[in-house]
A protein has these predicted regions:
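Single, function-defining residue in the core of a domain
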Residues: 1-235
Length: 235
């Protein structure tokens, strides 16, 4: 499980577990690595009271999609159409109003006949984060699916499994892939800055092929004329 920085498309804060390790256990470790100045987006299947609570400790703002079956009382309608609500550790706690964490509920539909989307946000003041702006930002959540595909297929190639056959070496393979992906994305970010464009506008596959061509020229990643050439080529 990992975090993604949406501007650079860099994966960070990753956590690796065994087959029997639950996503909830990994997620709790990962959210502890959220930067305090971040806005964290998450899919509806990640939400739980303990995980929301753990993510808040990081200081980051949260914007998570909610499952349709979760009860979220609409306590007060705000100027932008969102609502103040509270989340509780259990139905019993909700009935007694014990342990509630204030949050903001944003509801919207994408078209006729489609279900309602619900976003839960830790930013309570709509003036700091209007509902429409948050809905637009949430679309970036899908970026992580594209980036994980880069890691699984475009960087590693068509192989279905990692090459190692023992746990310790498999872990090393995993971290090596993450480091390689970080290196590619870091160079793409530098190239994007050089050309004043978004990193997401560059082709990851093209970047990997370009780096592979230039790699024999390098013994390290120290700044050099060759590195400058690589940045321009990537753009």
């Amino acid at each position: 499980m990992t975090l993604l920085e949406n501007g650079t498309h860099v994966l960070f804060g990753a956590e690796l577990g065994s087959y029997s390790t639950s996503e909830a256990k990994l997620a709790k470790k990962v959210v502890a690595r959220l930067p305090a100045d971040a806005l964290c987006l998450a899919d509806r299947y990640f939400f739980s009271y303990p995980l929301w609570q753990a993510a808040l400790v990081s200081g980051a703002a949260l914007l998570w999609r909610m499952r349709a079956d979760l009860v979220l009382p609409k306590l007060k309608r705000l100027a932008d159409g969102s609502y103040l609500t509270k989340i509780y550790p259990s139905a019993r706690a909700r009935a007694r109003d014990i342990g509630g964490i204030p949050a903001r509920l944003i509801t919207y539909r994408l078209g006729k006949g489609r279900g309602e989307y619900r976003l839960l946000c830790s930013i309570l003041d709509p003036r700091k984060a209007p509902a429409l702006q948050l809905v637009d930002l949430y679309r970036k959540r899908w970026t992580i699916e594209t980036v994980l595909a880069e890691l699984k297929t475009r960087l590693r190639g068509p192989r279905v499994v990692l090459r190692s056959r023992v746990p310790n070496l498999t872990r090393q393979d995993f971290w090596a892939l993450l480091l390689a992906h970080f290196g590619v994305r870091a160079l793409m970010h530098e190239a994007a800055l050089e050309e004043k464009i978004e990193a997401g506008d560059l082709s990851f596959t093209h970047a990997v092929r370009t780096i592979a061509r230039y790699l024999p020229l390098y013994v390290s990643f120290f700044p050099s004329p060759q590195e400058k050439t690589l940045q321009v080529t990537l753009a």
